[in-house]
UniProtKB/Swiss-Prot annotation:
Protein name: Histidinol-phosphate aminotransferase 1
Catalytic activity: L-histidinol phosphate + 2-oxoglutarate = 3-(imidazol-4-yl)-2-oxopropyl phosphate + L-glutamate
Listed GO biological process terms: L-histidine biosynthetic process
Transmembrane regions: none
Keywords, alphabetical: Amino-acid biosynthesis, Aminotransferase, Histidine biosynthesis, Pyridoxal phosphate, Transferase
Taxonomy, superkingdom: Bacteria
Residues with N6-(pyridoxal phosphate)lysine modification: K222
Lineage of origin: Bacteria, Bacillati, Bacillota, Bacilli, Bacillales
Length: 370
């Protein structure tokens, strides 16, 4: 028995190494994971409180329509409840959209590098993938527009982008939306939306009324600190969302996930404190990069992508041996970079000292051979 031919060309998603795996592999007792862009400050205390009240519901199926969460999220965003589609993390939302819209003979347009699951699910559905290289680390919307044709079903824009942390400016997005054919669905993946503080970062939800071919994705995994519970959602026009509901698995978001998302949503003070501390953490890395002349992309997320002057895999391995897990840029096709999640202040301080050692060693090598 053989699976789809498309599956034979793909590899299963490989996440960042987990803590227990690294402990076993390197014989370490203390590990700091800065690889998967998780919230180092955890989640709201209200989440813990919500969990204690759920024991009596474990034997029951969840609300398949997520009515209470749907209502609260809609109110929070200022949209209609019918505009929301919930999934088990944005991974499932991306899968649902791809399954519903793509097939052989269609194509998708996206940046490179960007979040890998856009490409992954397009290939599974038999669609052509048209990738456009980033320009100075940012989506090149002009070049992406040139790749769009009558068979383009989806244009993916990860904003802010993973793995670079960069963003598309408001005016450039508006120009793109005015130019792109209405037959192509433009999806703004805003998984890191809560961290984006740039003045010209586009606020996309108000644009949904004007652009029916626009959709916005958001998640509770990042700034809200609920990655373990797997819950994200799409916001779009009611007709399309209603059609996509057909592709959604029954009971796809658990009672636990819905309950903790509600609790997290109600604690905006905790969220804002996390965002504030994250910004302070980013500036720790900026100061290091400027002092040591290390290339980096200014970030609108909770991670930073930088280049130390050595292969990303080498930096990854050497940091891991010291107990720090990051992501090698090689995983994204950028062999000379690494992506580091912003951690607690002391974690940032500690890994920055290790980064300084790597940079100094490289400088000494270059001086030796010069």
């Amino acid at each position: 028995m053989r699976v789809k031919e498309q599956l034979l060309t793909l590899r299963a998603y490989v996440p960042g190494k987990n803590i227990e795996e690294v402990k076993r592999e390197y014989g370490l007792s203390k590990i700091v994971k800065l690889a998967s862009n998780e919230n180092p400050f955890g989640c709201s205390a209200r989440v813990t409180e919500a969990l204690t009240s759920l024991a009596s519901q474990y034997a029951l199926y969840p609300d398949g329509h997520a009515f209470e969460l749907r209502t609260k999220v809609a109110k929070h965003l200022g949209v209609k409840a019918e505009q929301l589609l919930f999934g088990s993390g944005l991974d499932e939302v991306i899968q649902m959209i791809s399954r519903a819209l793509l097939h052989e003979g269609t194509n998708v347009v996206m940046a490179n590098p960007t979040f890998s699951q856009y490409h992954h699910h397009a290939v599974i559905e038999g669609a052509e993938v048209r990738e456009v290289s980033l320009k100075d680390g940012i989506h090149d919307l002009d070049a992406m527009l040139q790749q769009v044709d009558d068979q383009t079903k989806i244009v993916w824009i990860c904003n802010p982008n993973n793995p670079t942390g960069t963003y598309v400016e408001k005016q450039k997005l508006l120009s793109f939306l005015e130019s792109v054919p209405k037959s192509a669905l433009v999806i703004m993946d805003e998984a890191y939306y809560e961290y984006a503080g740039a003045e010209d970062y586009p606020q996309t939800l108000p644009l949904l009324e004007k652009y029916e071919n626009l959709m916005v994705l958001r998640t509770f995994s990042k700034a809200y600190g609920l990655a373990a519970f797997r819950i994200g959602y799409a916001v779009g026009n009611t007709e399309l969302i209603g059609q996509l509901e057909v592709a959604r698995l029954p009971f796809n978001t658990s009672t636990v996930a819905q309950s903790v998302a509600l609790a997290a949503l109600e604690d905006q003070a905790f969220l804002q404190e996390c965002v504030k501390k994250n910004e302070e953490g980013l500036h720790q890395y900026y100061a290091f990069c400027k002092e040591y002349n290390v290339f980096y992309y200014p970030s609108q997320t909770n991670f930073i992508f930088l280049k130390l002057g050595i292969p990303g895999n080498e930096a990854f391995e050497r940091l891991m041996k010291k107990g720090y897990i990051v992501r090698s840029g090689a995983a994204f096709g950028i062999d000379d970079g690494i992506r580091i999640t912003v951690g607690l202040k002391e974690e940032n301080d500690e890994i920055i000292e290790l980064l300084k050692e790597l940079v100094n060693e490289q400088v000494q090598k270059e001086e030796t051979y010069s």
